[in-house]
UniProtKB/Swiss-Prot annotation:
Residues 109-118, 179-198, 261-326, 388-479 are cytoplasmic. One of its GO terms (biological process) is blood circulation. Belongs to the G-protein coupled receptor 1 family. Disulfide bonds join 155-231. The keyword Magnesium does not apply. This is 5-hydroxytryptamine receptor 7. It comes from Homo sapiens. Signal peptide: none annotated. Gene3D superfamilies: Rhodopsin 7-helix transmembrane proteins. G-protein coupled receptor for 5-hydroxytryptamine (serotonin), a biogenic hormone that functions as a neurotransmitter, a hormone and a mitogen. Ligand binding causes a conformation change that triggers signaling via guanine nucleotide-binding proteins (G proteins) and modulates the activity of downstream effectors. HTR7 is coupled to G(s) G alpha proteins and mediates activation of adenylate cyclase activity. SUPFAM superfamilies: Family A G protein-coupled receptor-like (SSF81321). Changing residue 344 to A: Decreased G-protein coupled receptor activity in response to serotonin. Residues 1-83, 141-152, 220-237, 353-363 are extracellular. GO terms for molecular function: G protein-coupled serotonin receptor activity; neurotransmitter receptor activity; serotonin receptor activity.
């Protein structure tokens, strides 16, 4: 029950003094009307202000000006800014350089201008766009503590470029995995259809689908979070599920399925990759004559050996191609998953955790996962160069400023590799076993040699294997 003063009115000032300002109100004059102190013009006001201003300042950061509670900022020191700026600049420059090498190599080297490499060029262009149009603005924003300084209009443009380029890179990786799978499982029919027009249609579809994800925020379905300090993609539940599913989860599922199919084909090929032994020679097919072994059915045996070697080379070629495709695609899928999975898991969960108005995730966590995803654009050119000898040779020539005769070098390198494969047996132990058996069973024959022998008296000459009865005689010695 509320207290009243002597005049019958509630003692509001006493309640304010005792409950709202219990510490400051001690020792102040009575604020009630009966106390004679004017609550407005009394001398307590300066004293109250001095007491309040003398209190310790809070240790937490002041809330931002916007009502949404966005705009968390980090104040870096000078050393931290130098270290972070150097790392981000290095990532950006290496991404630009690596993807420029890919584009220049495929466009200007005749041997690399193949339809299958058009997808690699599209991937390099998407990654290059990320490095040129996205990374610099994110770097500046991070160095000043997370505050967006480029305005409201450019925020929407920046988000559209970021989403489109990153999605195009991810979807191109997905299409490359499908291309590799079809090339392995349909080696006779797919290369016929794999022409420039088909590749151009696939690339155009990838970029159009990537652009479609950026359209909803621009046309009013889901507005981006955009004010004086924050530039964040829309946190609408429906748009978040749609964009993350199309940009990441569906392509990742397709890539994992393609890798599993190629890996299964490689395992199946390895299980069937039996190296047939050389035909056994039965005892009744060998005739010992004068200590020299002669082999029957020589023509049939040589034909069998030739067929076995051809079958061997074909099996090994298929097996190596499948193994290389499985290894390459496995590394690509692994790097892609490690780089982008944390970011998209966070992006999917953020609206359900923080709501649709802003982000409550610590800024350093968001930026770490974001730059980890951007790093995928950096490593893609080096992954393909590691597994492609022609790209490695072209990179080396371009970095050494040896621009002339690159096509001739690639042709010579390819011819040298083909000669090495032709001279080197695919399975040395198999060919050695066959050749050794042939040498042991059928030694090389030599023509007869004529010699003059001298004997006295008559005796049996073991070399000629006959009885010599004359003083001189020309004898033909057979092997």
């Amino acid at each position: 029950m509320m207290d009243v003063n002597s005049s019958g009115r509630p003692d509001l000032y006493g309640h304010l003094r005792s409950f709202l300002l219990p510490e400051v109100g001690r020792g102040l004059p009575d604020l009630s009307p009966d106390g004679g102190a004017d609550p407005v013009a009394g001398s307590w006001a300066p004293h109250l202000l001095s007491e309040v201003t003398a209190s310790p300042a809070p240790t937490w950061d002041a809330p931002p000006d916007n009502a949404s509670g966005c705009g968390e900022q980090i104040n870096y020191g000078r050393v931290e800014k130098v270290v972070i700026g150097s790392i981000l600049t290095l990532i950006t420059l290496l991404t630009i350089a690596g993807n420029c090498l890919v584009v220049i190599s495929v466009c200007f080297v005749k041997k690399l201008r193949q339809p299958s490499n058009y997808l690699i060029v599209s991937l390099a262009l998407a990654d290059l766009s990320v490095a040129v149009a996205v990374m610099p603005f994110v770097s500046v924003t991070d160095l000043i503590g997370g505050k967006w300084i480029f305005g409201h209009f450019f925020c929407n443009v920046f988000i559209a470029m970021d989403v489109m380029c990153c999605t195009a890179s991810i979807m191109t990786l997905c299409v490359i995995s499908i291309d590799r799978y079809l090339g392995i499982t349909r080696p006779l029919t797919y290369p016929v259809r794999q022409n420039g027009k088909c590749m151009a249609k696939m690339i155009l579809s990838v970029w159009l689908l990537s652009a479609s994800i950026t359209l909803p925020p621009l046309f009013g379905w889901a507005q981006n979070v955009n004010d004086d300090k924050v530039c964040l993609i829309s946190q609408d539940f429906g748009y978040t599920i749609y964009s993350t599913a199309v940009a990441f989860y569906i392509p990742m599922s397709v890539m994992l399925f393609m890798y599993y199919q190629i890996y299964k084909a490689a395992r199946k090929s390895a299980a069937k990759h039996k190296f047939p032994g050389f035909p056994r020679v039965e005892p009744d097919s060998v005739i010992a004559l004068n200590g020299i072994v002669k082999l029957q059915k020589e023509v049939e045996e040589c034909a069998n050996l030739s067929r076995l070697l051809k079958h061997e080379r074909k099996n090994i070629s298929i097996f190596k191609r499948e193994q290389k495709a499985a290894t390459t695609l496995g590394i690509i899928v692994g790097a892609f998953t490690v780089c982008w999975l944390p970011f998209f898991l966070l992006s999917t969960a953020r609206p359900f955790i923080c709501g649709t108005s802003c982000s409550c995730i610590p800024l350093w966590v968001e930026r770490t996962f974001l730059w980890l995803g951007y790093a995928n654009s950096l490593i893609n050119p080096f992954i393909y160069a590691f597994f492609n000898r022609d790209l490695r040779t072209t990179y080396r020539s371009l970095l050494q400023c040896q621009y002339r005769n690159i096509n001739r070098k690639l042709s010579a390198a390819g011819m040298h590799e083909a000669l090495k494969l032709a001279e080197r047996p695919e399975r040395p132990e198999f060919v050695l076993r066959a050749c050794t058996r042939r040498v042991l069973l059928r030694p090389e024959k030599r023509p007869p040699v004529s010699v003059w022998v001298l004997q006295s008296p008559d005796h049996h000459n073991w070399l000629a294997d006959k009885m010599l009865t004359t003083v001189e005689k020309k004898v033909m010695i057979h092997d």
